[in-house]
Amino acid sequence: MQGLLFSTLLLAGLAQFCCRVQGTGPLDTTPEGRPGEVSDAPQRKQFCHWPCKCPQQKPRCPPGVSLVRDGCGCCKICAKQPGEICNEADLCDPHKGLYCDYSVDRPRYETGVCAYLVAVGCEFNQVHYHNGQVFQPNPLFSCLCVSGAIGCTPLFIPKLAGSHCSGAKGGKKSDQSNCSLEPLLQQLSTSYKTMPAYRNLPLIWKKKCLVQATKWTPCSRTCGMGISNRVTNENSNCEMRKEKRLCYIQPCDSNILKTIKIPKGKTCQPTFQLSKAEKFVFSGCSSTQSYKPTFCGICLDKRCCIPNKSKMITIQFDCPNEGSFKWKMLWITSCVCQRNCREPGDIFSELKIL
């Protein structure tokens, strides 16, 4: 009887072993004895590997691209820019408000695309507008703010011939509200051609590419660190892209401006410098070197001083969290004082009504 029982248990054990080897055996059980569940979650690729293995030389990032530590906490990398592929190791540029959007890679959420964290608003004539907000800066235009950019369309289509404002016909009076704007609208039809977007671009042949570039826009701030931009195709792919640079016209400290000495018999001091060199600060990071830049000065009358001659330099910034990045910057060599003062970012500054 005992031999029969032993044989039965042995055969049952062998059968269970064979079934498991063939993959047809019973499901694994949990520690509590319940049948385990097979997970349907896809396996994600592991981008981080420890211990860390980093190249001996740090990567050289293009100007404007941050040098940061990767998401694994190991090596220095060039941060990914808007539209580039990112993952848990290849981080997006933190100094530009970017994050890795994994929404397209469902359900793995393994790789994403760098995108801006929040759609920023717009600033025009010292007034802040929210993203998507429609506003009317003057009677001629209606504008829309979209992620820091402003687009405007004319509210009127001028009629250059057959004007109903030339005189009343049949004893009827014309609408004086529209007639008062008609001289402005007539000039609007041609004056737009003087704006920067319609000017001929400077042309340069370089490496089989016809290089084109618009003029740099005025600095976004009259004091402190600002940004100016232009559109150019001076790149490896010869594609039209927006290029940005830092600009620093004047310090914002009013006490510094009070110390500027205007020569006797003069009403303006076009340029001035601080007594000692200082480091630039941008996005919470400071320049690796100290600089003594030339600033545009002040006038006793209503004139303002703007850069006249300048060159471009590259500034290296280091951050508290061991990251770093480079930016191109406007380096002023001389300034000129004029009565035609414009607010920074005024997109209508060159639209002249004659």
UniProtKB/Swiss-Prot annotation:
Phenotype when changing residue 100 to S: In PPRD; uncertain significance
UniProt record, GO biological process: cell adhesion; cell-cell signaling; negative regulation of angiogenesis; negative regulation of cell population proliferation; positive regulation of cell differentiation; regulation of mitochondrial membrane potential; regulation of reactive oxygen species biosynthetic process; signal transduction
Signal peptide: 1-23
Main subcellular location: secreted
Compartment annotation: Secreted; Mitochondrion
Disulfide bonds: 48-72, 52-74, 54-75, 61-78, 86-100, 92-114, 268-305, 285-319, 296-335, 299-337, 304-341
Residues in IGFBP N-terminal domain copies: 44-117
Effect of residue 145 to R: In PPRD; uncertain significance
MF-aspect GO terms: growth factor activity; heparin binding; integrin binding
GO CC, one annotated term: extracellular matrix
Glycosylation, residue list: 178, 308
SUPFAM superfamilies per UniProt: FnI-like domain, Growth factor receptor domain, TSP-1 type 1 repeat
Key words, A-Z: Disease variant, Disulfide bond, Glycoprotein, Growth factor, Mitochondrion, Secreted, Signal
SMART domains recorded: CT (SM00041), IB (SM00121), TSP1 (SM00209)
Organ and tissue specificity: Predominant expression in adult kidney and testis and fetal kidney. Weaker expression found in placenta, ovary, prostate and small intestine. Also expressed in skeletally-derived cells such as synoviocytes and articular cartilage chondrocytes.
Domain (TSP type-1) ranges: 208-253
Domain CTCK, residue spans: 268-342
Role: Plays a role in mitochondrial electron transport and mitochondrial respiration. Through its regulation of the mitochondrial function may play a role in normal postnatal skeletal growth and cartilage homeostasis.
PANTHER family per the UniProt record, alphabetical: CELLULAR COMMUNICATION NETWORK FACTOR 6, CONNECTIVE TISSUE GROWTH FACTOR-RELATED
Family per similarity comment: Belongs to the CCN family.
Disease affiliated with this protein: Progressive pseudorheumatoid dysplasia: An autosomal recessive disorder characterized by stiffness and swelling of joints, motor weakness and joint contractures. Signs and symptoms of the disease develop typically between three and eight years of age. This progressive disease is a primary disorder of articular cartilage with continued cartilage loss and destructive bone changes with aging.
Protein name: Cellular communication network factor 6
Gene source species: Homo sapiens
